[in-house]
Amino acid sequence: MSSIPAELKYTKEHEWIAATANPEIFRIGITDFAQGALGDIVYIQLPKIGESVTAEKVCGEVESTKSVSEIYAPLTGKIVAVNSGLDKTPEVINSDPYGSGWIAEIEISGGLADAPGLLSAPDYEQLTA
């Protein structure tokens, strides 16, 4: 069974969203369920800092020994940070998807109330059951 932290928000595409100290910046990554389905991750194409992203549109990709999967932006905004350590050690996503395996940070305006289709932990758990 995969881990689903209660304090995060989720998408149907298996991304997670975490609040940061700045109320307009959110950290994103792929869920434990997603990394488990992908298998051993060998490469990640990160979004670029300064790039504008649109919710539910592709912003990167993850390559594993099984397949290539697109990463969808869970929020509309601008990329303000990426986890460049994943360039050399993408497998960290497998071992710590909610911690050191984070992918990017997105600056948004309007807060999460304006974000479409975000799921609570119980709703995401139902989706993956």
Stretches with model-predicted labels:
Residues 14-17, 62, 71, 79:
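Conserved hydrophobic positions within beta-strands
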Residues 11, 20, 64-65, 74:
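A short, compositionally biased micro-patch
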